[in-house]
Structure formats: structure tokens, C-alpha cells
Amino acid sequence: MQDSYYLMSKNQFQDLYNDNSIYFNDESNIENIISCENVPFGSTIEASNNFDSNYNCNNINNGGINSFNNSSSIFKSMTPKKTPNGLKNLNNNIPTVNLAPISENVSTDTLNSQIVPSFQSNNIPQQIPSSNNNNNINNNNNTISSNNNNNTASIPITTTPTVVNNNNNNNNNNNNNNNNNNNNNNNNNNNNNNNNNNNNNNNNNNIPISNSCNFSNNLEKSTPIVNLIQYEQQPQQNNNIYQNNDTSNLNNNNIVCHTKDNENIETISSNNNNNYTYQDPNYQDPEKVQLTMNCFKLIQYCSQLTNLTKQAFSNPSAAACELETLSTMGNYIQYEISSLKSSLVKNLPNEAQQQQIRLQQQQSQQQHQQHQQHQQHQQPPTNIPQHINNCNIPRSPFDSCVPNSSYINSPLVANDFGYYSPNSMMNNNNDKINSEQGVFSSTISSPLPINSSYTSPYIKNQNSPQSKVVKKQLKNSKQSPTYINLTENMIRAQTKKQKKTISRVCVNCKTSDTPEWRRGPQGAKTLCNACGIRYRLQQQQVPQSNLNSPRESYAVIPTCDENIKQQTSQNSTTNINSSTTTTTATIQQQQQQNIPQQFPQPIQSPLKMLNIDQQILNSYENNFKNQFIEKDFLLMDSFE
């Protein structure tokens, strides 16, 4: 539940300012408050504000607290609050001892105004003034000044405080404290205890507004001066007050107040001499208006909560209803804080907007970096001293300065020193020197010298289409360890030697050119393709009738007459291994004896070869003299 407030007009504000009916000390007013079932919200703040200033130690039996407010014109509210039940027992439960006023600061913001304070660390006790407001006060000045030379009231040191009451009527009320009677015609206030003289000087009244309660401990209190601004733009507007000083620096406890109608009020501190200006609110922006209302209500609720807490502390007979009022005020404060927070969160950018802002920042940074790189690439290299040319600074971890070699400075080289690094400048100078000396400068950075045999194939084919493609790829690529390795691999691939080929000769036909080498009786890759096929077919075609006969046919390889002629011619010119000579000898012996060649028939099963008699093995060994072939090898060869 939230109270509805309205903005007072200029006339209403002036009426409230001149209305002194809210200040009273009559006991009948307390009876009226107790008799009322409902009172407007905000009536307790005036009572607590004037509690310390009007606390009369001599008049304790009459109630002690004589400043409860019965007017509802200060804080307008549509939500009435019940009167605390503790006030009914107020007259009977006040202690009979003289009490000093509470030493805490008391706020007297009794106007429906929005205050934005900025606190200063002033360790000056506040003073609660007694309100001397008359209907005939003429305000002519727009500043409030507190000076030591304008002391218009002499405050005696007494042990009992005095209460100054102001009446709008011309009637004179004689009380126990000799109250001042303010007449509308003369504007003269007479106080026997305080001896305050109010001088009427051209309708400019010097009104003492600080009457301190002086006790034996000399405790003093002061109230902050509330600055008000009236606006004539709308009939109902809030009064924005930007109060920059919470406590006014006062000397000798005297303040002379000069005010003027329809003017802005400024506070001037007597010691600091600070002028405070005020800012008009912008009523066209609803968000700012909402923030203003939230701040005003929050300050008002906090002030009321402070006053209610002081009242409950000073009243020993506080009922449970008053404590509930404190909790209710706390709930109002929490509600205003949450509404203020929600209105502030609305002004913050969303997550999507934040992401867009981040993307824009990243894009702008990238564009800036690209622009800088482009400018660096376009700038020509400058001349460098000669001693830098002779330095042995490597261009990369893989390169080094080699004599008779040159490097070309590429704009895409990424180093730690930028475009004008010592490495790049050294390379540019080397190019110039080498060009003057007639040395060919290669387009690839290589640690090898130019005149070396490794780089010559690449230099010869430099103008070929394939080399141009390689150049483009190298320009587009960045310098890195992989880039250098690729160039070295390209050079190595072009200068790579072929593997050494072993010269083989067929044991049977003595040929060295064959698509495939096959296994023979002497081992693997000893026969050419044709001889190996014939040898395998001969082993598979074994006649059944010759299974028990000596296997002389296994060693015979059918050869053509040309191969035989080649064998005879080669035997006369070249020396052949002992293994080849033995085979040729056996073939020649067979030809001389005119032994008919026997083609064996296929064996029914290869497993029958395992049952070959020992005589077959002996006959096979006799045919191939000077050859020691193991039995296991022969058996495995027969299965193929």
C-alpha cells in the first residue's frame, strides 16, 4: 500500500508556512488527538520534531510533551493511520524527574518537499528552534545568514527550558512559562525568561529561531535549515530541495532569518561561506519525475521512521500498535527502494545492446589494426648505418647470416620490432649490396648459399609456370617455421637422388631385364619371370609312373636354343659364380648324352611328396653336384 501525495501550489505553501496552529501546548489538544480514532498519516512526525524543543521540565505533570500535531495539512495522505494507544496513558506514565533532551540529531523537515542532501562532516551539535511564525511576517530577502554580529537574542543560562508559542489570533494566552504574544499589528514578541526583542525595521523582522535548552551539561542541538523552492508552472508540483549542508555552522546559538515571498531561498554557512544553488526539475520526462518521487518518499519515510523510533524510546508506555507502525514504515521504505531500483535498472542497456556494443568495439579495433599495418607496409625502408649491415642477427630461428646469400624483405614478415626492425633493415641493405656486386638474389629465404649445387636446379627452373605458382603461394603465406620447412623440402625433392638399383642376372638364361624376379632352386629372386614360371610348372607336372624313380627331371629347366647359345658365348668372355657354372655343366652333359627330356605329370596330391623315398633325394643330389641343398628347402619348394 502506497500513500498518494500531491504537489502544493504557491498559495497553499504560503498558508502552511504562516500557519502556526500546529504548535501548541494546550492539554486540550492532546485530548483531541486521543479522542480521534483515525488521524492522517504523518501527524506523528511533527510531534516528534518539536518534542525536544518544547520539552518543559517544569511542566511535567501537564504532559511533558506539548507538541503533538493535530493538523493534516503537512503530509497529505489517503491512508489514515490509527492513533497509537500508548498516548492514552501518556499523562500518567511520564517520570517526575528532570530529564535532559535526547542527544541525537532531530530532523524538522515539516514540509512536503523533496530533499537531496549532501552531508558534510561537521561535528557541531544541532539546535532545535522554537517556531515563531506569524501571519504578518514580511519576507524580503532571499538568503539565510548566520553571523556573529547579528545577535538579536540574549540567551540566559538557566536550568529550565522555555517554550515559545505563536498564535495567529490577537488573543493573549497567559501560560506558566510566560509565552510570547505576537500581534498582527505590532509584531512584538516579549519573553520574560529569554529577553528576546523582536525589532520591526521596515517590515524586516529579526526573528530568533534558536532557543536552546541550557542545562548543567550545556547540551545543545541544532536543526538543518530546510531550503524551499516554489514553482508556478503547475498548480500542483513537488518542491525540489537540494540541501547541500545538513547542519548549519552557527556561532553563539543565534540565527537571524530573513525571508522574502516568491523567491528562492539560499543557505549561507557562517564559517564556510558556501553558496548553494538549486536545480529545477524536468517535469516533461516521466522517468525523472518517478525517480524524484521515489527519492522524496524514501527520505520522508526515513525521517518518519527516525522520529517514531525516538518517540517509542522516550515513551515508556509504548504500545504494540506503535511498534507495528515502525515495521509498517520499514515496509514502505523497502517498497520505495525496490521501485527506485527498478526505475534505475530500466535505464541500463540490455544484454543484446551490450553485445552489440562489444562487437562494434571489436570491429573498430580490428579496422584500426589493419589500417596501421597497411600504413606500415606502404612506408619505404630508410637507410641504416653500415655497422648494422654486418651484424649477425638471424632473421628467424631457422635462418642465419651466410656469406654470398641475400634475403628479400617481405612486407608480410611478422617480427617483434615491426617493419623497421634491425632484421628487416639488414635484409634490405644486403639486397642492394648483392645487386651491385652482381650476385643473384633468390626469392626464397634459404640458409644455403646461392652458388651451392643444391639450389641450382631450383634457380634454373625459376621462370617456369610451376615456379611462378610457388612464388604466389609463398607471398600469400606468412613466415613461420612451417613456411621455411616447405621451401627446404621443395629444394630437397628436386635434388633427391634415386635409390641404388642392384644388377641382377637370371641364373638360367643370364638376362638382366625382366619385369619380375622369381624364386629358383638357388633361392629367391634368382630366376627371371619366364624361367621362374617354367620352373614352377615343371615342379607341378610330375608323372605318377616316375614317383618311385629318381627325380632327375626336377632339376631340368626347359630352355630355348638362343639361351643356350648365349650361355656358351658368355662363358668364354665372363667369369660366372660357381653356382652358375655347375648348372651349365649339368645342362651340357645332358645335351651330350642326348637324354630325352621327360615332362612329369601332375601329382594327385602334394602330400604324396612327403613320402618320397630316400633314393629320390639321393638321385637329385647326384644330378646337382657341388650344390648342398637342404631337404626341407626342397620339400617346401615342391609345394609351390
Swiss-Prot record:
Mapped zinc finger ranges (GATA-type): 506-531
Keyword Zinc among UniProt keywords: yes
Compositional bias (Polar residues): 380-390
UniProt entry tagged with the keyword Amino-acid biosynthesis: no
Gene3D superfamilies assigned: Erythroid Transcription Factor GATA-1, subunit A (3.30.50.10)
Example GO BP: regulation of DNA-templated transcription
Keywords, alphabetical: Metal-binding, Zinc, Zinc-finger
Name by which UniProt lists this protein: GATA zinc finger domain-containing protein 12
Species of the source: Dictyostelium discoideum
